[in-house]
Amino acid sequence: MSAPPLYRLTDERRVSLVRDVGQVREVLDEDPVGSCMVACRVLDYGVDPNAIGGELWTRRRVDESLCYAGANLIPLRGGPDDIAAFADKALGSPRRCSSLVGRAELVLPLWRRLEAGWGAARDVRDEQPLMALSAPPQCAGDPAVRPVRMEELDAYLVAAIEMFIGEVGIDPRMGDGGRGYRRRVAGLIAAGRAWARFEDGQVVFKAEIGSQSPTVGQIQGVWVHPEWRGRGLG
């Protein structure tokens, strides 16, 4: 028997904390590419907020409305009333997330309600394609690209910082001098999720597996050294 949802009142809209991992997995399985960031957490740790680094919200039934609220706010399913309820819940709670991620038809209306309370976004990418391969690539991989070793952290970190500044527009070393970002990058290397091509000790190409479910791996942090661009490395 499914565990009953735990209801919370948010401006007369009932928002519940999801506790049934089976229902969540059914929803995530219907969109394995779009839900990869959430699926990798749920499949490993279930729906316990402490284990997955955030809460899973629903307003009615999980197959009708679902939103992940953690370091990222990720609406996965819902109509206009559901999105409004999720926004009100986020506005009424201490802010945790730094970005909204997901399908534009869900993220953009959610952000329109949040913007008045949270202030202007640093960047709104309303047309950012989500690309996926459904078959093996038609070109051969670069044999020089390999997993990064821990002793190469310093060299790899230089490229990672350049990538972050170019992609996000801010320096990841702000605030704590880069200690937190260094730990994050070191964690990716330790997990075997950081890949690069080195030439004379310098990174000329890098990419990372940010999230990984049993069926989908999300490639992020792709970067090519400026002097090596235009050669097909990317």
For each of these PLM feature ranges, what is it?
Residues 30, 34, 96, 191-192:
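Structured helix-beta-strand junction loops
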Residues 40-71, 142, 186-207:
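Conserved beta-hairpin
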Residues 60-64, 68-143:
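Acyl-donor-binding surface of acyltransferase catalytic domains
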Residues 138-217:
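Flexible, substrate/cofactor-facing loop regions flanked by secondary structure
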Residues 55, 127-131, 193-195, 217:
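Short beta-strand micro-motifs in enzyme catalytic cores
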Residues 74-75, 211-219, 229:
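A conserved beta-turn-beta hairpin within the catalytic core of GNAT-like acetyltransferases
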Residues 2-37, 136-174:
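Short amphipathic alpha-helix that is part of the acyltransferase structural core
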Residues 221, 225-234:
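Conserved glycine-rich acetyl-CoA-binding loop
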